[in-house]
Amino acid sequence: MQVTETLNSGLKREIKITVPAGDMEAKLMARLSDARNKVRINGFRPGKVPVQHLRKVYGKSFMAEVVNEILNDSTRSIITGRGEKAAMQPEVIMTEDEKEAEKILAGGTDFEFRLNYEVIPAIEIKDFSDIKVTRQVFDVPDAEIDDQVKRVAESARSYEPKTGKAAEGDRVSIDYVGKIDGEAFAGGAGTDQLLVLGSKEFIPGFEDQLIGTKAGDEKQVTVTFPENYQAAHLAGKEATFDVTVKEVSKPGELEINDETAKNLGLESLERLREIVRGQIENQFGSMTRQKVKRQLLDQLDAAYSFEAPSKLIDAEFNNIWAQVTRDLEAAGRTFADEETTEEEARAEYLRLAERRVRLGLVLAEIGEKAGVTVSDEELQRGLFEQVRRFPANQQQEAFEFYRSNPEALNALRAPMFEEKVVDHLLGQISVTDVKVSKEELMADDEDAETTTKAKPAKKAAAKKAEAKANEDEAEEPKKKAAPKKKAAKDAE
């Protein structure tokens, strides 16, 4: 087998591989000899079929198997033998001339093919001692736990029907149909909708106009969708809702005790508080980690500047762009609504893709040098966590999909590996803990945001794409935005 380099430009490579006709013939004859004792051909005793007769019958199909074997087995070894790592699966280029292909299958000529690929650049790992990050720490006060426990208790609160007028805090059961300019709009209708007045679950002004109504009342509610409403075709428009009040209920006494916890399936109020505290600490801990990770990645980004494989960048960009356009479409928004243009957004997201690929290569090299791995046990735990995100009736199907799909498992392994590399780095760099308030921790850190973000990144439609690839900014938990309300839920 002869290997000749025909292109070496930047990260791009093309090599020509020539397998002499004699080598192809030897591989074919080995297959024919092996098949001689296995095939059954009328007129011949088992094991007595002449090789040349076998060649006449099976020669081309066996030679095709030889070709596939060479392509499958030699591609990786050839590139590894050159001391290179391919960024993606190499493109295999073979002759398109039918006569030439026939000669190869007949064993009458050398087999030539080309491999077209990009290499992973050599990355020299730098000293980490100069990297310094600040870790914001929020000590969750008891008052925070008390507030959340109260919200949990309120969600389980009982209501009793009443005959009087609805007041703030009462719950109403309503049917409604929303209209704009006299025409009903998609997602603007509901039946037997339970609504606690004052909960701000519906768009501003809706609940206020139902105060004072009684069961059996019909009420026309007029509201204006907020200018920043997620469904752009509804934003800023006035709408009327024909509402039928079917029932008014008053809340029962709010009790926060062991009995409340037992009604929620827990043994005691103390256990409920433990669970709530754990959830809150995990939430804020996740926010703390994402901010630390962002600082770390920003400094790594500044420290490493090299050409990244264009095909990896293209693949990453396509993933980001698909997510962004899906989110925009789902929200009924356009790039103009996001205060940008498609051209500007493409340029910004391309820079984001370049950054992600470059940082991914740096983290992979750091992890490899440090011996970071994801164990089978860790992958199994990650798989179970992923499967639990599916509806109960789909979990077994999802589990089988991951178990039988190596690419899906690798996609699950990659972010786990990245997080372990980040953990490794946090043990190597200077980390200073600073106690902050809840507001400081939850505040968007504009100064720390990467310059590779697109303008839509500050909008809801683009945030999912930012967080999806475990980049430097995770979507932080925020209070549900007022405009995103039930009255137009399906229209968003």
From Swiss-Prot:
It catalyses: [protein]-peptidylproline (omega=180) = [protein]-peptidylproline (omega=0). It is found in: Cytoplasm. Residues 480-492 have a biased composition (Basic residues). InterPro entries: PPIase_dom_sf (IPR046357), PPIase_FKBP_dom (IPR001179), Trig_fac (IPR005215), Trigger_fac_C (IPR008880), Trigger_fac_C_sf (IPR037041), Trigger_fac_ribosome-bd_bac (IPR008881), Trigger_fac_ribosome-bd_sf (IPR036611), Trigger_fact/SurA_dom_sf (IPR027304). Its EC number is 5.2.1.8. Keywords: Cell cycle, Cell division, Chaperone, Cytoplasm, Isomerase, Rotamase. Residues 441-492 are annotated as: Disordered. It comes from the Bacteria. One of its GO terms (molecular function) is peptidyl-prolyl cis-trans isomerase activity. GO terms for cellular component: cytoplasm. Signal peptide: none annotated. Pfam families: FKBP_C (PF00254), Trigger_C (PF05698), Trigger_N (PF05697). Its main location: cytoplasm. Residues 169-254 form the PPIase FKBP-type domain. GO terms for biological process: 'de novo' cotranslational protein folding; cell division; chaperone-mediated protein folding; protein transport; protein unfolding. It is an enzyme of class 5 (isomerase). Residues 463-479 have a biased composition (Basic and acidic residues). NCBIfam families: tig. Belongs to the FKBP-type PPIase family. Tig subfamily. Involved in protein export. Acts as a chaperone by maintaining the newly synthesized protein in an open conformation. Functions as a peptidyl-prolyl cis-trans isomerase. Consists of 3 domains; the N-terminus binds the ribosome, the middle domain has PPIase activity, while the C-terminus has intrinsic chaperone activity on its own. This is Trigger factor.
